[in-house]
């Protein structure tokens, strides 16, 4: 399985040519799963997980919300999966790139938490990706006792929706999904959330709006969306004029019904601070360490920020050996209490 950081910016450049920034802005809020996979950069890493995960824990769907959206999700129950990681290299056209091989025993051996989970953790992927990218973390956290819900956010993976809202609508989607999982007796309390990049921004927004979210882990959250988009441009498609992207990012909030800065977690945190474990990558050009620390400075207690030196944006979620203890400790300490 190939992991790639889908660059809608590249698609926009190909599609727009010399078209106005307003067109580019509309493409940037378009559902990523509606774009053809014709243009993509060479992956900066590859990863695999046991194929049996997909068959043993099948994809499910729930139609929720108003207007309705059908969200695809997958549930991994607590069990001992004996998850293990081998790090090697894949030969790319420009040299070796990391290959993360996650292995495990599926369907796993029952543990005391299989019948009585610590709680539910909802895992949210990055922009343009799908729930598959969070399967390694789901295996690890399920081993530690949590029931894990993997979700394709609207416009991603196997979920529908013609546009994305950078957290404004997605938070309501997730609340409606948890309500439906309660009805199906598939959710348990307390509810925690772990998100990566775009998914981290959605996770923070959801924590602000949903009191049933008791704990959050935000991995590489951007502080300001425009800065993150510029980081993608500079890091991946530096030949694309910065002015086009800057003007497009300035127009995006109004296209989803928000005011200036309305898609920026830094602005949200100023007025509705929440606590979280913030995780930064030392060499991140999309969600820079300074941006993550600035979010932490505005966060409510309890909060903590940790940094993985030398890691880049796309690598950080797979540095599980360095992050596993901090993440599980945070969830245990702040997300395992009984609901009020």
Model-derived segments and spans:
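Catalytic histidine-centered segment of alpha/beta-hydrolase-like enzymes
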Residues: 311-321
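Short beta-strand/loop motif that positions the catalytic acidic residue
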Residues: 271-272, 278-280, 284
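An N-terminal hydrophobic leader/cap segment in hydrolases
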Residues: 18-111
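Catalytic active-site module of serine/aspartate enzymes centered on a nucleophile-bearing elbow/loop
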Residues: 319-340
